[in-house]
Amino acid sequence: MTEQFWQQKKLEEMTEQEWESLCDGCGKCCLHKLMDEDTDEVYYTNVACSWLNSKTCACKDYPKRFTSGEECLKLSRENIAEFNWLPLTCAYRLLAEDKPLPEWHPLITGSKSAMHAAGESVRNKVVYAIDVKNWEDHITNHPHRS
């Protein structure tokens, strides 16, 4: 990969490898969201997809994530504008908005350690739907806050 390719290319110009490497692996996109029926506001919860490993923040079966029966959505160059619910720290969202990557991003630091240390991942912060009785009790923040 070209060094700092994300500063030199637009999202649509990136190779598949570059595109995939933008994901910091925080796991935030693997959390269930709730939508207010009246306002269409999206609320984040700490309820994880059953395929998310809460320690590694990675999908337990990444290659099969779109056929697993879970509601995993494929983020692509063509549909990035539809994903306005992505966290404010998401590299795809940041670059689409012409903003820089955060200083803890693995592409900058070389590892995920800084992301975890900054508290920007869902590591050990989630519950699974099977354990949830009232989803509204699991709302973690206001829409679009990181």
UniProtKB/Swiss-Prot annotation:
InterPro entries, per the entry: Puta_zinc/iron-chelating_dom (IPR005358), UCP006173 (IPR008228)
Domain of life, per lineage: Bacteria
Pfam families (alphabetical): CxxCxxCC
Similarity comment: family membership: Belongs to the UPF0260 family.
PANTHER family, sorted: UPF0260 PROTEIN YCGN
Protein name (database record): UPF0260 protein VF_1660
Organism: Aliivibrio fischeri (strain ATCC 700601 / ES114)
